[in-house]
Amino acid sequence: MAQRDGEAPLNPRVDSATGIVVHVVGSRQNRPNLPATGCPFCVGGLEAPQPYSTTWIANRWPAMPDGRCEVILYSDDHDARFMSLSHTHATSIVDLWAERSSVHFARADTSSVLIFENSGRDVGATIDHPHGQLYSFDHVPHRTAARIDAGWVPSLDDQLSVRTDETTTTSVAYASAYPVALEIAPRRRVGRLAELSPDERLGLAVAMQDALQRLTTYFDTTPPYMLWVNQRPSTSTDAWLNVEIVSPWRAPGVMRYIAAAEVSTGEYFTPLVPEQLARSLREHLSSPR
């Protein structure tokens, strides 16, 4: 695929001292922080000339070249949010995630596909319209590889459990750099979204909505959050699909900043006890839908 004007070549730098991978993308310095004239994802906007339910578009400001970055539009309703959509609509988003992931996994130059969402100014979201993104990597990112090498599986610790149903489990992460961190996984071991059955896709969508609703009740307002889907890369034969949802809030409106002692050492100090958070989230039932 031809490289677009302004795109940086896919040639990330690696810090020789730490192994940290850095993509230098100078073109993104010109990316607008907020739309100057209306929302580009609303009907009639720059990216959405016609009404839609869910759809995808190429990212105009890609972090990587060669069509590796896409935007997943959840709804043409600017004020909708993933957790507020009907279960059917939310499942259609999971279906689109699976479809676009499969397209990219089919590329010979793709090893790993990441689906993610940034929601809220505190985590860098620049457009309020409900949307997520897809990044297609030609290698397996370190964290993805580390979780697979460690044999990640859903937690069996009842003290960390938040919710379990016929198809899906939700737990608080045992040890996370973020004060709030949830892990959602299908009960059946599958590696990719495309391998989920229709019932499992519905179950995953409902579990994600439930988790976000519980967090909203817990904080008494919708917190900023980051959500991403961990899928089996092309280099692996076995992995357990899971979704992570994290928030930088440690209390309503109070950020838990990751500062010098943590950045410099890679060790973190969290003020929220995961087991206590799980108990609170179990008690903060999600709103009926």
What are these model-derived regions, one by one?
Residues 203, 207-220:
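Extended C-terminal subregions enriched in glycine
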